[in-house]
């Protein structure tokens, strides 16, 4: 089923998709997926925290925020570029095609640390891997420098809908996020941009977040769908975990409205069984974060994933 590529979705349209009977929704999404992607092609991306903790932002879900003093987390300074590249090489040997590097910063500052990040990007690209970073807010000249270093994609999530956003984050505006994404796109960097479900948002909030993403022109190269991992010491520590059908609905709807985008299963994936994850792939997911740790949270291990992909007959992306 070849869906037209659109960037004019309304929130009502997206919400109507989210509310479809589940099997109808998954069936439609699978048709769209097969029209644009090989169904057994699942990209593996590895994610490393290159600077951990002490972030001045107040994101309610994040254990790396300096505002959440009860979280048990060891702060770590920015890693050495050579060490990061060696870890990228190890991830590549384990099957990862993309290496993503995250620094717990509010925004990038020019200087030695940014120069080191640029060296990391160049080193990862020299391995033949795709390189992605998430560093907080950028200015236009910094996006240009990242592009010149060979950066494949910049991750900067919207997190949730514009309407619900203020209940989760108070130190950075929604427009700040959109501005950084625009600077990256202007520099020729692909966008990796998604959000989180399970923070107390409504179904309409989920639809509104997807609508913002689907109305980018062109659509983001990849859209990570995260299920909240409640972390003790954060304001969302006692939120109920997301059920699999909520995640499947998000994946399927993202696939229908963004046919060419890689839809990535991200945080919270390890909560779900192999059969539940397979349902997400049937609904259109075609990328995962691969490895034992996802920044500071546990992730499905490479051994379990190898068994899963073997059972699915999934191919490695070239």
Swiss-Prot record:
Amino acids binding [4Fe-4S] cluster: 55, 59, 62
Keywords assigned: 2Fe-2S, 4Fe-4S, Biotin biosynthesis, Iron, Iron-sulfur, Metal-binding, S-adenosyl-L-methionine, Transferase
UniProt xrefs under PROSITE patterns: RADICAL_SAM
Cofactor: [4Fe-4S] cluster; [2Fe-2S] cluster
InterPro entries assigned to the protein according to its UniProt record, in alphabetical order: Aldolase_TIM, BATS_dom, Biotin_synth/BioAB, Biotin_synthase, Elp3/MiaA/NifB-like_rSAM, rSAM
Broadest EC class assigned to this enzyme: transferase
Binding site for [2Fe-2S] cluster: 100, 132, 192, 264
EC number: 2.8.1.6
Annotated catalysed reactions: (4R,5S)-dethiobiotin + (sulfur carrier)-SH + 2 reduced [2Fe-2S]-[ferredoxin] + 2 S-adenosyl-L-methionine = (sulfur carrier)-H + biotin + 2 5'-deoxyadenosine + 2 L-methionine + 2 oxidized [2Fe-2S]-[ferredoxin]
One of the GO BP terms on file: biotin biosynthetic process
Radical SAM core domain boundaries: 40-260
Cofactor info, note text: Binds 1 [4Fe-4S] cluster. The cluster is coordinated with 3 cysteines and an exchangeable S-adenosyl-L-methionine.
UniProt KW Nucleotide-binding keyword: no
Pathway it works in: Cofactor biosynthesis; biotin biosynthesis; biotin from 7,8-diaminononanoate: step 2/2
The keyword Transferase is assigned to this record: yes
Gene Ontology molecular functions: 2 iron, 2 sulfur cluster binding; 4 iron, 4 sulfur cluster binding; biotin synthase activity; iron ion binding
Family designation: Belongs to the radical SAM superfamily. Biotin synthase family.
Subunit organization: Homodimer.
Functional description taken from the UniProt entry: Catalyzes the conversion of dethiobiotin (DTB) to biotin by the insertion of a sulfur atom into dethiobiotin via a radical-based mechanism.
Protein known as: Biotin synthase
Lineage: Bacteria, Pseudomonadati, Pseudomonadota, Alphaproteobacteria, Rhodobacterales
């Amino acid at each position: 089923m070849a869906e037209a590529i659109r960037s004019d979705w309304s929130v009502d349209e997206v919400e109507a998709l989210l509310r479809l009977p589940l099997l109808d929704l998954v069936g439609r999404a699978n048709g769209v997926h097969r029209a644009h992607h090989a169904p057994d092609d699942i990209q593996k991306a590895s994610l490393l925290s290159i600077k951990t903790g002490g972030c001045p932002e107040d994101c309610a879900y994040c254990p790396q925020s300096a505002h959440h003093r009860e979280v048990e987390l060891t702060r770590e300074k920015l890693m050495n570029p050579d060490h990061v590249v060696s870890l990228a090489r190890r991830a590549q040997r384990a099957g990862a095609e993309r290496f993503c590097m995250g620094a717990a910063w509010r925004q990038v500052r020019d200087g030695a640390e940014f120069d080191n990040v640029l060296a990391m990007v160049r080193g990862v690209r020299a391995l033949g891997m795709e390189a992605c970073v998430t560093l907080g807010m950028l200015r236009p000249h910094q996006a240009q420098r990242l592009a010149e270093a060979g950066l494949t994609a910049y991750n900067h999530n919207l997190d949730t809908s514009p309407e619900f956003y203020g209940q989760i984050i108070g130190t950075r505006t929604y427009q700040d996020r959109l501005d950084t994404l625009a600077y990256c796109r202007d520099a020729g960097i692909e966008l990796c941009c998604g959000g989180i479900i399970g923070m107390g948002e409504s179904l309409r909030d989920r639809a509104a977040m997807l609508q913002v993403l689907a109305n980018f022109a062109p659509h983001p190269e990849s859209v990570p769908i995260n299920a909240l991992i409640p972390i003790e010491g954060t304001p969302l520590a006692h939120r109920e975990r997301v059920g699999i059908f909520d995640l499947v609905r998000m994946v399927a709807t993202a696939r229908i409205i963004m046919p060419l985008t890689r839809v990535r299963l991200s945080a919270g994936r390890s909560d779900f069984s192999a059969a539940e994850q397979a349902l997400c792939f049937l609904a259109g997911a075609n990328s995962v974060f691969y490895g034992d740790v996802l920044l500071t949270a546990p992730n499905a291990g490479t051994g379990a994933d190898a068994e899963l992909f073997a059972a699915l007959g999934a191919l490695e992306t070239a």
